[in-house]
C-alpha cells in the first residue's frame, strides 16, 4: 500500500449512517420557510455545502435578483441549522457498516484518514464529539498517527465556504497532513459531488459508496473509479490494490 498515503472520506451516508435524515431536515426547513423543494432536487445536491442548496432552490423559485432572495436564503438556512443540529444532538448516531474496522486497518497500513463534509463546522463538531472521533484532534482539527482520524475539514474552513465539487477540502487536508502528491490520495463518498471533487483534486481514485443517499444506478451515471455497497467492500478493494 505504499502508493496510497491518505483516504478522504465523506461523513453522512459514507462513514456515518444516514437514513435520509439530512434530506428530511431540508424538507422541514423548506416547509417552514415557504420554499418549494422536490426530493429529486434535494437529493441531487446532497454533499454540497448546505447554504448552496438553499441558494440554488431559492434561485429556482424566485431568482437571485429578487429583493427577498438573500433574506430568504438566510432564513431557510437558519431554520435548517436548528433542525439539523437538534437532530444530531438527540437522535441515535452510529458509524456505517465496516467503518471502524476500515479505520483500524488503514492505521495498520500507515494510511492517514481525513473526513470532509458538506456540513458546516458546528454540526460537524456535534457528530465528531458524539462518536468520539474528535479525540486527539487539535484546534485546527488535525490529529496524530494515534488519533482515530488525522483531519477533519469542512466548507467553514475554506475561502468563501467553497466546498464540493471544488477540490479545496481535499487539498487542505493534504497540506495539513504533509501530503503533496494527489496521486497518493483516494476519495470516497455517497454523492455525485463526492465523485466530482475526487476528480477535481486529481486523486488516484474517486470511489462511490451506495449505502447512503444514492443508489448504485444513480451513482453509475457519473464518472467514477468503482462503486461499493459498503466500506467493508471498499476495504477489500484497497487490500487488492496492495497486491
What are these regions (language model features)?
Residues 121-186, 192-200, 216-218:
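Substrate-recognition "cap/lid" segment bordering the active-site pocket of phosphatases
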Residues 226-233:
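Short acidic-hydrophobic, aromatic-tinged amphipathic segments that line or gate anion-handling sites
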Residues 2-100, 108-109:
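N-terminal helical cap/lid subdomain that shapes the substrate entry/recognition surface
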Residues 211-222:
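Short, glycine/polar-rich helix-capping loops at beta-to-alpha or helix-loop-helix junctions
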Residues 85-115, 119-132, 167:
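Short, acidic loop-to-helix structural element flanking the phosphoryl-transfer center
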Residues 17, 189-190:
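Acidic di-acidic motifs
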Residues 2, 109-111, 177-182, 241-242:
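Glycine-rich phosphate-binding loop signature in dinucleotide/nucleotide-binding domains
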Amino acid at each position: 500500500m505504499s502508493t496510497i498515503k491518505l483516504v478522504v472520506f465523506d461523513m453522512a451516508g459514507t462513514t456515518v449512517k444516514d437514513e435520509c435524515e439530512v434530506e428530511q431536515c431540508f424538507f422541514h426547513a423548506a416547509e417552514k420557510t415557504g420554499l418549494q423543494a422536490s426530493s429529486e432536487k434535494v437529493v441531487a445536491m446532497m454533499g454540497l455545502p448546505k447554504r448552496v442548496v438553499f441558494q440554488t432552490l431559492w434561485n429556482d423559485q424566485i431568482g437571485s435578483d429578487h429583493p427577498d432572495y438573500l433574506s430568504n436564503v438566510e432564513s431557510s438556512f437558519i431554520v435548517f441549522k436548528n433542525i439539523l443540529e437538534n437532530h444530531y444532538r438527540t437522535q441515535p448516531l452510529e458509524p456505517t457498516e465496516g467503518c471502524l474496522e476500515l479505520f483500524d486497518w488503514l492505521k495498520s497500513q500507515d494510511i492517514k484518514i481525513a473526513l470532509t463534509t458538506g456540513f458546516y463546522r458546528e454540526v460537524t463538531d456535534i457528530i465528531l464529539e458524539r462518536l468520539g472521533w474528535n479525540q486527539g484532534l487539535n484546534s485546527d482539527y488535525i490529529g496524530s498517527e494515534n488519533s482515530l482520524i488525522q483531519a477533519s475539514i469542512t466548507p467553514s474552513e475554506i475561502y468563501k465556504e467553497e466546498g464540493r465539487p471544488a477540490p479545496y477540502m481535499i487539498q487542505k487536508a493534504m497540506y495539513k497532513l504533509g501530503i503533496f502528491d494527489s496521486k497518493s490520495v483516494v476519495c470516497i463518498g455517497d454523492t455525485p459531488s463526492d465523485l466530482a471533487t475526487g476528480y477535481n483534486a486529481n486523486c488516484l481514485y474517486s470511489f462511490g459508496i451506495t449505502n447512503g443517499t444514492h443508489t448504485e444506478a444513480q451513482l453509475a451515471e457519473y464518472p467514477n473509479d468503482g462503486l461499493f455497497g459498503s466500506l467493508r467492500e471498499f476495504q477489500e478493494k484497497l487490500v487488492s490494490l496492495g497486491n
